[in-house]
Design a protein with these regions (language model features):
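Feature of Fe-S/electron-transfer and energy-metabolism proteins
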Residues: 2-4, 20-21, 26, 34-37, ...
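FAD-binding subdomain of flavoenzyme oxidoreductases
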Residues: 75-82, 86-231, 236, 424-426
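N-terminal flexible segment immediately upstream of the FAD-binding catalytic core
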Residues: 1-33, 50-84, 113, 242-253, ...
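Conserved, mostly hydrophobic/aromatic
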Residues: 35, 180, 420
């Protein structure tokens, strides 16, 4: 039972009554009806790759839940060539959906490092983002239909995928990002995209976050002027401490001629000739044209979570700020963390293109939240969000007020009460 009750960070976890692994929507409905009748909490769980405690029970307080594992609901339907859509079981992994789409001549718009363990249901429940948000948007932008079981065991099925359907509330959009607090997502209908063409990937050293943003802006201009029809697909950022850590843990060498405070990863759809990159002789960069070399460059970014996990218990702060304020906020966060003795190791990496920073802190005990709160309060001062793509979970439930007004929180609580009047769906997540 251990894999179901402790999350990836090793910071969150607690007891449960049982772990059940239903194989159908009907079985899930029966479980929810039984739990509702007995007043027992329910915790839906996908691949348990969450980083904010939303996919595991609380350590203490309240009645232990029944964990509903979705890992048997793995069916992926045939790709509808006419609409460019497919219906996917909640337990299928992101990687399985990606490969299924590619075999049919399509691609799915969401991608992230945990693709082979994160489930589709989990990515929908958290409205996952990943590396291609600038091109395709968050998970919510991919979802065109949903099937879910509500707290009382009733089943809602809306999987037609019609793009024009204004008959009432958009329940798919509501359940996307709800973190298991409104119901159990069992299947989704998602839109697919045609392949974009050959890409070029580059790691580029810059002196600051301001320079990183300027470089990203120039990449967009270069794509438009040098390679008509091309586009910026991804823009990632990795600071020097994070680069050093991943090099040490993953046995990678520093990829550039010089050391830089910030390294930017750009992926551009440009026919694979590098014409979409803003490069000249003054830039310290390494460029990859074939897929093997591109995967090697992506490893510096995608193995960051592994690197910080090897360093100890990680406090992971997934935040976002408006792009015009990102550089100032990042600089202030680095200066702030340098003053905190408990923050023995820290760094920033993330999705530059959409203002999403992953602030990683190793050193504080699992329940020592002083550094966490300092980071979240700093982000709030810049008008940012305390959760960019990982969800609120248990980790940030008490901090929701930092970026949501009292009126907004009251409205969300009202929705929660309407769909889950007994408060049995993932209690303690999203709201404290």
């Amino acid at each position: 039972m251990a894999p179901f009750v402790t999350d990836w960070t090793r910071r969150f976890g607690g007891p449960c009554i049982a772990v059940v692994r239903p194989g159908s929507v009907d079985e899930i409905a029966q479980i929810l009806r039984a739990c509702a009748s007995a007043g027992v909490p329910v915790l839906p769980q996908g691949g348990n790759t969450g980083l904010v405690g939303g996919s595991v029970p609380a350590a203490s307080g309240g009645q232990p839940p029944v964990i509903i594992s979705m890992l048997r609901l793995t069916e992926i339907g045939e790709v509808d060539e006419l609409s460019g859509q497919v219906t996917v079981g909640a337990g299928a992994t992101l990687g399985e959906l990606q490969r299924h789409a590619v075999r049919a001549g399509w691609r799915y718009g969401v991608d992230l490092a945990a693709r082979d363990s994160a489930t589709i249901g989990g990515t929908v429940a958290t409205n996952a983002g990943g590396i291609h948000v600038i091109a395709h948007g968050m998970t919510r932008a991919q979802v065109v239909g949903i099937e879910a079981v509500l707290a009382d065991g009733s089943v809602i099925t809306h999987l037609s995928g019609m793009l024009k359907d204004n008959t009432g509330y958009d329940l798919a959009a509501l359940l996307c990002g709800s973190e298991g607090t409104l119901g159990v997502i069992t299947a989704v209908r998602v839109r697919l995209h045609r392949p974009l063409g050959r890409t070029t990937v580059s790691l580029i050293g810059v002196g600051s976050y301001s320079e990183a943003l300027e470089l990203m802006s120039r990449a967009g201009v270069a794509s438009d002027s040098n390679a008509p029809g091309s586009r910026l697909l991804a823009a990632e950022v990795i600071d020097e401490p994070s680069m050093d850590l991943v090099c040490a843990v993953a046995d990678l060498s520093w990829p550039l001629e010089q050391r830089w405070p910030v390294v930017v990863l750009l992926e551009v759809v440009d026919g694979g000739d590098g014409s979409g990159l803003p490069l000249d002789e003054s830039v310290d960069a390494v460029v990859a044209f074939d897929s093997a070399d591109q995967l090697r460059l992506w490893a510096y970014r995608e193995r960051q979570a592994e690197a910080y996990g090897a360093a100890g218990v990680v406090h992971k702060l997934d935040v976002s700020v408006p792009l015009p304020k990102l550089a100032a906020c990042a600089d202030e966060l680095v200066a702030l963390l340098a003053t905190l003795p408990e923050a023995e190791t820290f760094g920033i990496f993330g999705h530059l293109a959409d203002g999403n920073m992953h602030v990683e802190i190793v050193g504080p005990e699992a329940d020592d939240l002083r550094a966490d709160l300092a980071v979240l309060e700093c982000v709030a001062r810049y008008g940012g969000s305390i959760s960019a793509e990982h969800g609120v979970g248990r980790a940030k439930a008490a901090d929701l007020h930092l970026c949501r007004s009292a009126a907004e929180i009251a409205a969300m609580r009202a929705i929660k009460r309407a769909l889950d009047p007994q408060g049995l769906m993932n209690p303690g997540v999203l709201f404290d």
